[in-house]
Structure formats: structure tokens, C-alpha cells
Amino acid sequence: LELGETAGAAGIGLLDAPVSGGPIVAQQGGLAIMVGGDPALFDEARPDFEAKGSPFRHVGPLGAGLTIKLVNNMIAISAAPVVLEALRIGLAQGMDLSTMVDVIRASSGNTWLTQEWDQSKMFLQFALRDPSQLEGFVATGLKDMELVASTCAAAGIDAPLLHHSIRALEELGVEGFRSNLATVLEALQSD
């Protein structure tokens, strides 16, 4: 917001426009773009957003794009390890992976990870083959969650589940993710 004030004082318009979707979605041109800032400037920049991804949406004043991005990441980062652990539990109980994913997709437990299962499988396989990808996911996830926590602290917002998710992600760590991934991917190969 300080940058917006500085830019505005110099007669320069500024939008914040974070994206969501990950590398596979980016390659397909399907990144979601959340744009904060002056609506007139958003309309002026619309052709640039159309060229970059879809969907894109004006979400409010400067800073609103980042807020929605962080809220979205909190949900996705908190849900991903739960989904993988739940699938691992189902596999340990003899359930078929494809059957579980199909039922979850049509049920209240559906998340992006299960809804976009083909893309998720590609990412999961890539992350297991390349440890730096998994390490990057965990590190970036923790960074984003800490940003949400600091935003909440500054605004006086109580967020106990956020703090629980951060602790759980720290405790699970890369090795915990890797273990859950390996179990799920082993089931994929026999699927």
C-alpha cells in the first residue's frame, strides 16, 4: 500500500495482481488472476490480463488481490496435506485410489487437489521425483501461511486454525509429505 501511495503521488497507477494455479496451470494459460486497485486502471489493463490468464477478476482496492491470494493459499496449503493423508488412510484400509477420488470429487470433501486430479497427479509425481520441488512447496507454503498470520496479527484477527495449520505443516515437513506422496503414487502405478 505504501508503494501505491508513492506511485500515486508520482502520477503512476498501480495494481496488485497475484496469480494462482501453479506451474502446470500456468503452462495451459489458466492462471487465476486476482487484481486489486483502481477499477479504471483495471479496465485499462484488461487486455494484458486477458493475454496472461483466465479467470481474472477485479477484487477491490489496492492490496485486495494479495489478500485474496493469501486467503486462497491458506485454504489450499492447509487442505493438501489433509487430502494426501486421507487418501493414504483409505489406501491402508484397502480402498481403490480412483474410486476414492471419484467419490470425493462428488462429495463435500472435494478440493482442487481432487477436482483437478489429472493435474494433481502430474504435480505429485514431479514433486516426488524432484526433491527441490517438494521442498519449495513446503517452504513457500509456510511463507504464505506466515504472511497470513502476520496480516492477522496486525489487524487483530484471531486465527487459531491458521496457527494450528502452520504447526502441523512444520511438524509434517518435507519427509512427511514425501511419505504420504510415495504411498499415493504407489497406488497410482497399480491403478
What residue spans do the PLM features occupy?
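Rossmann-fold dinucleotide-binding core
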Residues: L1-N73
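Histidine (H) residue identity feature
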Residues: H58, H163-H164
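Helical "substrate-binding/catalytic lid" subdomain
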Residues: G65-D158, H164, A168-Q189
